[in-house]
Amino acid sequence: MRWDDGSYSLRMTLQVNGYVSPYPVDPMPDWVAALRDSAAPVWLFAYGSLMWNPEMPFAERRPAPLRGWHRSFCLYSRDYRGTPERPGLVLGLDRGGSCQGMAYRLPQDGLGAAIDQVWAREMAGEVYRMRPVSVTTPEGRIGAYAFVVRRDRPDYAGRLSLDDAARIIAVATGGRGTGRDYLANTVRHLEELGIADGPLHRLHERVEALAQQS
């Protein structure tokens, strides 16, 4: 199906781990749809839950630092980890710094279905855009695609101070649980993957301290 502007659309309701998003899945641009038939390898850069819970088939995974972007709790969540009245915060990939993540090569067999699957998971709510990036892996430098935040969207929180972010996360609860649990699980999974993220560790410590005070 195509929108009036010619872009390819996955008109579906997004459901991840039993939670149904209130948002439609964003239209898929033609250049992304063309990747579904790509003869060249298609790599995705993962910085958050895609690293430890990809929910998509993949043929290969490599550690991959990305320069020029960093992992940050920079997006308001009014459903998954918060409510419209009390928004929470979720991870995004924002400009500046660097980010240690994972690069996934999607399988050539069933490539289109894999791209559709990850698009349906990531592209709800008009808060991300998919863009090409260059990452370094142990086997060399490769081109990949990453889902980065859209700074023009109202749910973009910007660069909050440590205390401001901690106060939001410590009390936020949404359809998929508390912001506190989301942050703790993120830190734990990063540690299991051998990834040190100082800002997230400091944020986690501050959130836990606030929780002990309440």
Give the location of each predicted region.
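A glycine-rich, hydrophobic/aromatic-adjacent loop/helix-cap motif
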Residues: 10-214
